């Protein structure tokens, strides 16, 4: 029978949490019809062979919560056809459980290879069947995907593992009945865990370990049916106490919804999913209830909590369910979840966002017995009679109050808002209580596109009067509705309502008159879509749940749930997303919280105006303001200055001021203590009257935030309006790592196991948040192209097959990120000034071992141990290379940048000069600011003597060079003080005239590390340089570089040796070209040179080998760039800077004029200590 490969996945398909695929590929056959061997199989059914060997399907499905023990071992799956991928390599780990030396490794390798051949599809984690049971082997790694078929070209690698490693035999649990219970981890029974973590519980439940496949099917989705706690309201409770138990739990809001199909008993489709709480199965007995029972939930705020007028704690009913096994995790992780109750963030917010809550079984508790200072005291109540309703009463009429936000007050979104409100209550029977917050999701882009004035207002006149802004559409603008709850893509946003009043039905009113009170259900009522009347009666000002401790944006899918790079120990739905928070974000959040707090308003504190500045665009200032306001729970109203600014004279300024005041009034209508006014591109307000308008707006609001990318263009009167200025600088390496992690998680990007985001962040120096988003998107594009190329190489394989197989090939890997970073640097280098890392290594530098050691001492220590300089300790960040020209000072600086993965800035003297007063010094400041933004970075000043000569000796009338030197000295001092933000910037200067430099540059803390780069004084050093220069040449076998170096004089610099090698290669090329020309002339049929090289040339004709004669001829024509007299002069200069005159003493006092100045200049670096100069004077040549 033909074999067909299919991919299976549990239904519903679980969300991926790593690069592993939720699908598993298996081979299948379709049995013939009307065969006695194969009975009739129902449709949509797959039969799996029952054998003692572990089937990969069991392992793949063992951790999935959708397995159901219904009519045997049957469970819902999804199936799709696929083509298996041919594996390039398979790594198998093994160890022997028998005596050592029983089998040699070659025999074991043969057995494992034979076992792999018998497997039709190999999966990562599969157990390989071998002939002897004393040898256990498991597939550890498959490439390029996690599952595929073995071919003749597949490379099998067998590795012996230590028996003590847990990844050996009991990696995922013991083998029971020939089946490996991967992921069911019953190495520690529930009894052991409960005895460790739940000693304070009186009724611990003994959950037996799983030992058979039937147990897998019966325990993964629900609590074990073998326990005394069987699920369902009708279960027996003969062994339980009649008094309801009251337990205190830590409240945890969910970041993702738990699917209803995973709960047992399965709730009705019409039940409100927001009125459910989830606990571990063993904690249900502590409550004395079963999964699916009604319980009472109340906040535990102590004396300051939300209480009723009679002093009792406000509470509400909810249904309690046990966490599915997928969410509960392994037993050792469950200890971390002890005493936690999980609930919807909306329910958590309606309870008052408490840190802890109390739960009790009885929903008919008497609130008067819930006194201050006590938890919910157990109340002995009679069993409810048949007349007592088992669900909360149905509301006859519910009045909703609209929370005034920029979204809910936007005219263009009113039709979508009403439609979303209707959809919210029609999906299920919602349970509401007076004061509850209700979110309504709408598509902002779609709502604006479908906006029609004819369908603008609801039919009732009251609502029409409450919608403000019935004026010019410009008052609202295209971005006026952008507020809290808008996701990054601008698709979904949330508008909020609050429940005002609830009118009970006639039946509920009669029940209350017969002795029941409305508080028997905590004041909660059910909204029946068919009978309850919904009324929107006005609006109110208020806040929404802060996202700092409530993941409601993820829960409502406004922001996509993050995919962690590594599977966390606790399911992501049970944890708050760990987003990166920058120091500026934290500071801005504190300012917003302080300005909008009730205490500051009561004390009459002045409002705050914050100006966010940056030197680069797309750095994330506006997004920073949105997230800071979202953390506090206030709304944000955005105004783009370029949208309202007019063109023309004074009349346009008047219109701009009017539009600004009108929009600020709309922001104030949402509540000055509940709304933040955000103005972007504040530099566009250049008119004088705008400063007065901004001052009035700030006085009417509690906090105003403005952004600009060029603070120098902001008029001084406008800038004086702001009380705080926060600079959003380019992110450093740690901040870029956090941003990359957050970007990849929010976009649901799966990363390969080899990816280290800190390494990627190191290569993205000088890139800001917007650029990092582009890098991730480019990497995603590169990943798609790579998978398309991989699929094209394999016959019949598509990209979809690779994605189903999973593994690193279907995820973003190092290759994708490298291509994305390279492309981003090439495209953004000119626009944002991102410096490039030169591709020069130490292999390009000949010798200089002592110079390399000195450089590593200066640069490597601050990079690897920054904590040594964190408290203000000065570091040595300045290096000065001096010596004859052509010794490779520039090349050495580039090699330093490459060796330490530093960015490289090369500054030339004319770049800093400007004809306007003050601009030259500003250019120096900009250079160092760009370096700080791109740190770790090297700033290289070539020909430093032309940039910073001695002050007072220049003839320019304005003293430009003197001011440049002074500014350079100030920046160098800032680099060495060890202040925050100054680390990671190293300054390197190069000059062949150090005697012309300003003496102040050579003092400690500036260029205090002076290294002399001279010519090679031995033939061995010349040989080292020649080997570095010719490492990419094709040298003739008879050529000896050592022989060539012995003929060279000691006056050749590195540049001279480079010219020698280049001329030798040129002569070799000329010689080979002459031979080819002669060969063409000797041919019978004359052909062109191009035709010869295209069709007739042999490898020997195009091969160019440099011979000794080529070097000798090049040497005859080479003239050294530095004479012997010049070298002697540089030696004297070196001695002047690196030696101490023993005879120097009182005679120095008698020196005057130039002699005295030279002595002062020499004394400067001389006092820097012996470590400031070369150690033994044995300098090597360089290139």
UniProtKB/Swiss-Prot annotation:
The question of whether ATP-binding is a record keyword is answered with: yes
Broadest EC class assigned to this enzyme: hydrolase
* Topology of the protein relative to the lipid bilayer: Peripheral membrane protein
Keywords (alphabetical) are: ATP-binding, Cytoplasm, Hydrolase, Membrane, Nucleotide-binding, Peroxisome, Peroxisome biogenesis, Virulence
Chief subcellular site?
Answer: cytoplasm
State whether keyword Cytoplasm applies.
yes
Q: What top-level branch of life does the organism fall under?
A: Eukaryota
Effect of loss of the gene: Leads to growth defects with sparse aerial hyphae, and reduced number of nuclei in hyphal cells. Also results in complete elimination of sporulation and trap formation and a remarkable decrease in the ability to trap nematodes. Leads to defective cell wall biosynthesis and increased stress susceptibility. Results in the up-regulation of the proteasome, membranes, ribosomes, DNA replication, and cell cycle functions, and the down-regulation of MAPK signaling and nitrogen metabolism.
Q: Which family does it belong to?
A: Belongs to the AAA ATPase family.
Any one Gene Ontology MF annotation carried by this entry is:
ATP binding
Give me the ranges of the annotated region AAA-cassette D1: 576-785
What does the record give as the reaction this protein catalyses? ATP + H2O = ADP + phosphate + H(+)
Provide the E.C. number(s) assigned to this enzyme.
Answer: 3.6.4.-
Which residue windows does the record flag with biased composition (Acidic residues)?
Answer: 183-204, 1173-1183
- Binding of ATP: at which residues? 883-890
Ranges for region Disordered: 161-205, 1160-1183
Matching entries from Pfam families are given as:
AAA, PEX6_4th
What is the protein's known function?
A: Component of the PEX1-PEX6 AAA ATPase complex, a protein dislocase complex that mediates the ATP-dependent extraction of the PEX5 receptor from peroxisomal membranes, an essential step for PEX5 recycling. Specifically recognizes PEX5 monoubiquitinated at 'Cys-6', and pulls it out of the peroxisome lumen through the PEX2-PEX10-PEX12 retrotranslocation channel. Extraction by the PEX1-PEX6 AAA ATPase complex is accompanied by unfolding of the TPR repeats and release of bound cargo from PEX5. Regulates autophagy and biogenesis of peroxisomes and Woronin bodies.
Protein name listed in UniProt = Peroxisomal ATPase PEX6
PROSITE patterns, sorted: AAA (PS00674)
Cellular component, GO annotation = cytosol; peroxisomal membrane
